[in-house]
């Protein structure tokens, strides 16, 4: 799972680097576990842009990932390690003893042919899923549920890992990749180990077209716009923003302004905010 760098054959390859894909052994997904994805270009049901700088991109099929890991007590065998265009982590096609096949996130160190298991009695090895109450302190975990039975919601990106640092009562204390320390019910399931493809953050797109393949459109800086279009715009030549604080195109404070609601139910479960928050 290394990174391949290009020589400067063209301006686009001068600073370009991509994943080697050496761990992938299958190019086409399991057809029964895929579905169509409709593109919305960042627009809502009325056609209004609600998320800017989105559109285009390569056509994708969605892979149905088993984040719940609710097939308990049934051994599974890793058949393939595959590329998933919808995430930067790799996925594994798993065949269970009863004949069912499911996709799961690829855990670092899991190889083709390995056995995995989900349930309270599963051994503590990468790829197995257990309730937090059955996982020892100090263990690295990922794909963590926030509510029992809802499926993993956090720590799912490539190379991410959380650590169990304490348990008290019905809650476990986790240190998340962002530096946040959070309480999670011990009945929640988590997968042992670290998410694979740890070099995902070391890739360099190298050219604008690579960003367009991902469905990301150009971002125009507000300081180069007209004053009618953005609060930072206007002025003669290269002018500063002319405000005490940076503002969004709609005049709201940004770049450091906290946007998280204090009325969220989980506010009391966060013991320490994430870094730079």
Curated annotation (Swiss-Prot):
<dbReference type="GO" id="GO:0019843">
    <property type="term" value="F:rRNA binding"/>
</dbReference>
<feature type="region of interest" description="Disordered">
    <location>
        <begin position="227"/>
        <end position="251"/>
    </location>
</feature>
<dbReference type="GO" id="GO:0005762">
    <property type="term" value="C:mitochondrial large ribosomal subunit"/>
</dbReference>
<dbReference type="InterPro" id="IPR022669">
    <property type="entry name" value="Ribosomal_uL2_C"/>
</dbReference>
<keyword id="KW-0689">Ribosomal protein</keyword>
<keyword id="KW-0934">Plastid</keyword>
<dbReference type="Pfam" id="PF03947">
    <property type="entry name" value="Ribosomal_L2_C"/>
</dbReference>
<keyword id="KW-0150">Chloroplast</keyword>
<comment type="similarity">
    <text>Belongs to the universal ribosomal protein uL2 family.</text>
</comment>
<dbReference type="InterPro" id="IPR014726">
    <property type="entry name" value="Ribosomal_uL2_dom3"/>
</dbReference>
<dbReference type="GO" id="GO:0016740">
    <property type="term" value="F:transferase activity"/>
</dbReference>
<keyword id="KW-0687">Ribonucleoprotein</keyword>
<dbReference type="GO" id="GO:0009507">
    <property type="term" value="C:chloroplast"/>
</dbReference>
<dbReference type="GO" id="GO:0032543">
    <property type="term" value="P:mitochondrial translation"/>
</dbReference>
<dbReference type="InterPro" id="IPR022671">
    <property type="entry name" value="Ribosomal_uL2_CS"/>
</dbReference>
<dbReference type="InterPro" id="IPR005880">
    <property type="entry name" value="Ribosomal_uL2_bac/org-type"/>
</dbReference>
<feature type="region of interest" description="Disordered">
    <location>
        <begin position="24"/>
        <end position="56"/>
    </location>
</feature>
<dbReference type="InterPro" id="IPR014722">
    <property type="entry name" value="Rib_uL2_dom2"/>
</dbReference>
<dbReference type="Pfam" id="PF00181">
    <property type="entry name" value="Ribosomal_L2"/>
</dbReference>
<protein>
    <recommendedName>
        <fullName>Large ribosomal subunit protein uL2c</fullName>
    </recommendedName>
</protein>
<dbReference type="GO" id="GO:0003735">
    <property type="term" value="F:structural constituent of ribosome"/>
</dbReference>
<dbReference type="InterPro" id="IPR012340">
    <property type="entry name" value="NA-bd_OB-fold"/>
</dbReference>
<dbReference type="InterPro" id="IPR022666">
    <property type="entry name" value="Ribosomal_uL2_RNA-bd_dom"/>
</dbReference>
<feature type="compositionally biased region" description="Basic and acidic residues">
    <location>
        <begin position="24"/>
        <end position="33"/>
    </location>
</feature>
<dbReference type="InterPro" id="IPR008991">
    <property type="entry name" value="Translation_prot_SH3-like_sf"/>
</dbReference>
<dbReference type="InterPro" id="IPR002171">
    <property type="entry name" value="Ribosomal_uL2"/>
</dbReference>
<comment type="subunit">
    <text>Part of the 50S ribosomal subunit.</text>
</comment>
């Amino acid at each position: 799972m290394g990174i391949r760098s290009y020589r400067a054959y063209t301006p686009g390859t001068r600073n370009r680097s991509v994943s080697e894909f050496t761990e992938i052994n299958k190019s086409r997904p399991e057809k029964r576990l895929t579905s169509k994805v409709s593109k919305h270009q960042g627009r809502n049901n009325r056609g209004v842009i609600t998320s800017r700088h989105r559109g285009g991109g390569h056509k994708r099929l969605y892979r149905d990932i088993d984040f719940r890991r609710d097939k308990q007590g049934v051994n599974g065998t890793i058949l393939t390690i595959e590329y998933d265009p919808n995430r930067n982590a790799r996925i594994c096609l798993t065949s269970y003893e009863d004949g069912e096949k499911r996709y799961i996130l690829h855990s670092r160190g899991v190889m083709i042919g390995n056995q995995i298991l989900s349930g309270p009695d599963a051994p503590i090895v990468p790829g197995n899923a257990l309730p937090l109450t059955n996982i020892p302190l100090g263990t690295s975990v990922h794909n963590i549920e926030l509510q029992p039975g809802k499926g993993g919601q956090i720590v799912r990106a490539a190379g991410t890992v959380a650590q169990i640092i304490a348990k008290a009562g019905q809650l476990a204390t986790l240190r998340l990749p962002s530096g946040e320390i959070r309480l999670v019910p011990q009945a929640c399931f988590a997968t042992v180990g670290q998410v694979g493809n740890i070099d995902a953050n070391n890739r360099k797109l190298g050219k604008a077209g690579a960003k367009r393949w991902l469905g990301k459109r150009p971002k125009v800086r507000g300081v180069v716009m007209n004053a009618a279009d953005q609060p930072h715009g206007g002025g003669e030549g290269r002018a500063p923003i002319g405000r005490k604080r940076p503002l969004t195109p709609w005049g709201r404070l940004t770049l450091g302004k906290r946007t998280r609601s204090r009325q969220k139910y989980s506010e009391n479960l966060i013991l320490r905010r994430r870094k730079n928050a």
